[in-house]
Every structure is written in C-alpha cells, then in structure tokens.
C-alpha cells in the first residue's frame, strides 16, 4: 500500500503539478491558495511553480550545471574548484581527491559529506550514503523543477572559514533578488545541520531589519549583529546580473578571507512555504515579484 501511495503521489506531481502544489499549500497552511490574486512572496512562488516555464529553474538548481551559467555571466572566479562528478557512488575516485573536500549531490540539500582524509574515513560508508541519496528530489516537497534534475555526485573545494567573523559556521549571505533588483540580504550563521540563525539586513546602507521576522522566529533564536561583508558592493553586482530575467530568485554567496564564493541559486526557498518572514514582509517582498 505504501508503494502504491508513493507511485500515485509521484504520478500526480509529474502530471498534475498545479493540483499538487495547491494541495500541499492547503496541508501546510490550512487554507486554499488564491491562484487569481497571489500577494505574498510565498504565494507568488507557488504561482510561478505552477504556471511559469521553470526549465531554467531546473538547470540553475543543478549544482553542477549552474557552474556554466556563472561562467557565462563572467563570474567564474567565484566558483569553487570542482574535483570530479559521478553518476554512480561506486565510481567516486577517492584516490584523486585532495586531503579535504566536500562531497555532495547536485540536486538536494541533505547529502553533504565533509571529507578529511587526515582523520580517516570509511569509504564504503560514504558510498552507501550516496547510493541512498541518488534518487529524484522534489516529490515529497512538491517542487516539480527539482524532480527533473538528474541526480549526480560532485566533489568540490572546501570553502575556508573566516575566523574574523563571529559564527560557528561559514556565514551564508542569501540575497533576495527580483529581476535585477537586490532587495535584502539574509545572513545565516551558526549552522548546525539544516538549522541555522537567519537575520534580515537591508542594503545601501547595510542595516538590520528584524521587524521582517515573525515574533516566534525572533524569540526562538539567538541573534548576532553581523557586519556587512567586506565585498558587499561586488556581491550585489553579481546578484544584479545573475537575477536579471527572473521574477524572483535567492542567490547565496560567501565572503571569506577576501574572496567571494558562489553558493547556489534558489527559486523556491523552503518550497515557497517560508515561515520566518512576517505577513507584512511577505507582502512587501511579494510586491516586487512581477508575474508573467
């Protein structure tokens, strides 16, 4: 019975995505999505997922293929070094990998393995891990454009920590962009697995805007006042160029030890069902999304 439900769910996402997107919204928020008058950022992301051509979303959400796009736009210097890419976990060439690197899939967000040969590692355990990860992503969260990405494994450079920044993890600068306009930056820090602290900073000048977060989110997290990244001006220029032509996209960058690194382009953050932003801020950000 479980297999049958899985098959039916997958079939519906593939062939009736708008119905399934609306169904998932109702499950998450307890109300129907207003397809005719979407106002918030979340609502407009749902509309775009269901009604727009998301072919480019699929290409640019692929952590391997997006690298060509970044080079085409003139920002190849922001890419981490790519050590290899494989279709099968058994084909990972551990002998050719450097002492430290990152292994992850190109299509998901939970497969990351930090490889440090100096500390020893279980090769077979890593292979089995990636065998489990090489499955289509996006069906459970009803994000159809992810389901079209061919799952692969990649090995890339480990971005160094910047010890001058007060964070237990790399600070992930997430820029919310609307067709060339960079609206804000959400610096995320003190990451533990998939959990992290995310703030809101407005730009030009860089200034905190926690009013855009829900009261529940503010009360359940310990915040730090993150200074503007040293290379903020160039980061914003990168975001302007990369986001042009897209109604909305979140562009993730790192600024560490004097260098900018590209992270990813995300077109439906949290499936377009984000809960950390207040209703008012959701509507403000949504007002910048021009639907085709």
Can you describe what each PLM-predicted range is?
Residues 67, 90-93, 109-114, 122-123, ...:
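Short catalytic/ligand-binding loop motif for oxyanion handling, primarily in non-cytosolic enzymes
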Residues 77, 168, 177-183, 244-248, ...:
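Coil-to-beta-strand transition motifs
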Residues 86, 107, 157-159, 177-179, ...:
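Short, flexible loop/turn elements at secondary-structure junctions
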């Amino acid at each position: 019975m479980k297999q049958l439900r899985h098959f039916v769910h997958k079939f519906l996402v593939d062939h009736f995505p708008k119905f399934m997107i609306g169904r998932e919204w109702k499950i998450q928020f307890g109300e129907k999505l207003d397809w005719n008058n979407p106002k918030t950022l979340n609502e407009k992301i749902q509309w775009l997922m269901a009604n727009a051509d998301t072919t480019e979303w699929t290409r640019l959400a692929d952590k391997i293929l997006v690298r060509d796009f970044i080079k085409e736009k003139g920002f190849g210097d922001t890419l981490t070094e790519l050590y290899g890419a494989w279709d099968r976990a058994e084909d990972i060439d551990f002998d050719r990998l450097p002492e430290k690197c990152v292994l992850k899939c190109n299509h998901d967000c939970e497969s990351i393995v930090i490889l440090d040969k100096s500390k020893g590692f279980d090769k077979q355990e890593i292979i089995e891990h990636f065998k489990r990860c090489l499955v289509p992503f996006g069906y459970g969260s009803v994000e159809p454009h992810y389901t079209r990405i061919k799952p692969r494994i990649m090995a890339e450079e480990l971005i160094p920590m910047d010890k001058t920044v007060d964070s237990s993890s790399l600070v992930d600068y997430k820029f919310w962009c609307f067709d060339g306009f960079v609206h804000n930056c959400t610096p995320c820090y003190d990451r533990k697995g998939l959990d992290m602290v995310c703030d809101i900073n407005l730009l030009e000048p860089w200034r905190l805007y926690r009013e855009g977060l829900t009261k529940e989110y503010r009360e359940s997290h310990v915040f730090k006042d993150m200074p503007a990244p040293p290379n903020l001006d160039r980061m914003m220029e990168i975001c302007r160029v990369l986001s042009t032509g897209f109604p909305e996209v979140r562009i993730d960058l790192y600024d560490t030890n004097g260098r900018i690194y590209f992270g990813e382009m995300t077109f439906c953050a949290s499936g377009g069902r984000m809960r950390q932003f207040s209703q008012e801020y959701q509507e403000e950000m949504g007002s910048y999304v021009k639907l085709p």
